[in-house]
């Protein structure tokens, strides 16, 4: 068993304040025995595509060096999101900052209709390894609506797929909407899905949800406030679906596909 944490937080256009929030919850998660903590989409810079030119940061920004320091000092891996400036383009990026000081980044590959007018899409679906060896994938917000992404990550070995969101309240009740499809992503691919959303009293609706490889809710909270949600991940349960000869392996559905029929 390992413990993961997901955060519902308020992140505005205040980098310093957002770093303090990162420090606060990373420390709490570490004290509660978590191996990794995941923050919502664009939690460092705030999610403001219309202000990407002003608020986006580069991969060598001091703020990201500070996140790396927080990970090291608290001995916990940290997943944080930000608007990234790279040369003449902008990306929606989520970084994995390991407690040993190493980093990896995932750039959102499937952009929303409005995001396309500002950001450039990433070019790769990545499998990343936590310090403890757990293999993870990342799907950012609207990307969770593409089953092919989750399936690809599962086939490449992902055990947990983190799904940081920046969804506004106007989009509807997050608990009801996620219940329609997030459990199916877990069940069909025999993985854990760990979702979290930005929150405030005006714009973002929040929500945290973790579903297990059986499609059951492992942990959830939709309180109208900032919070940290901790959940245990049963790696033996995941392995039981992927070990040949195990009675559950016949139900690792991605391995039974016939992709030649889909082309």
Predicted regions and their residues:
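Cys-nucleophile CN-hydrolase/nitrilase-fold catalytic domain and related Cys-dependent amidase chemistry
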Residues: 15, 24-103, 168-189
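Short polar catalytic/cofactor-binding loops
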Residues: 8-13
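Active-site catalytic loop in hydrolytic enzyme cores
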Residues: 85-160, 169-180, 243-248
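Short, acidic/polar
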Residues: 17-26, 146-151
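C-terminal beta-strand edge segments of enzyme domains
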Residues: 127, 198-263
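CN hydrolase (nitrilase-like) catalytic-core segments centered on the catalytic cysteine
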Residues: 61-79, 145-226
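Residue-level detector of high-confidence beta-strand sites
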Residues: 105-108, 163, 220, 230
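Extreme N-terminal starter segment of soluble prokaryotic enzymes
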Residues: 1-5
């Amino acid at each position: 068993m390992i413990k993961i944490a997901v955060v519902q937080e308020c992140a505005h256009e205040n980098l310093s304040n957002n770093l303090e929030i990162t420090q606060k919850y990373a420390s709490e998660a570490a004290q509660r025995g978590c191996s990794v903590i995941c923050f919502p989409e664009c939690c460092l810079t705030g999610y403001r595509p219309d202000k990407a030119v002003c608020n986006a940061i580069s991969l060598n920004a001091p703020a990201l060096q500070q996140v790396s320091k927080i990970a090291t000092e608290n001995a916990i891996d940290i997943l944080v999101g930000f608007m990234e400036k790279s040369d003449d383009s902008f990306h929606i990026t989520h970084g994995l900052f390991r407690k040993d000081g190493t980093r990896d980044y995932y750039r959102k590959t499937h952009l929303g209709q409005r995001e396309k007018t500002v950001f450039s899409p990433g070019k790769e679906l990545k499998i990343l390894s936590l310090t403890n060896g757990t293999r993870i994938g990342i799907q950012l917000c609207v990307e969770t609506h593409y089953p092919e992404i989750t399936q690809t990550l599962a086939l490449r070995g992902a055990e947990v797929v983190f799904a940081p969101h920046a969804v506004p309240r106007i989009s509807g009740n997050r608990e009801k909407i996620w219940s329609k499809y997030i459990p199916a992503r877990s069940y069909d691919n025999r993985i854990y899905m760990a979702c979290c959303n930005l929150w405030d009293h005006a714009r973002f609706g929040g929500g945290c949800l973790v579903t297990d490889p059986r499609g059951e809710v492992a942990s959830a909270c939709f309180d109208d406030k900032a919070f940290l949600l901790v959940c245990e991940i049963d790696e033996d349960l995941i392995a039981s679906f992927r070990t040949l000869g195990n009675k559950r392996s016949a139900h690792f559905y991605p391995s039974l596909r016939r992709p030649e029929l889909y082309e």
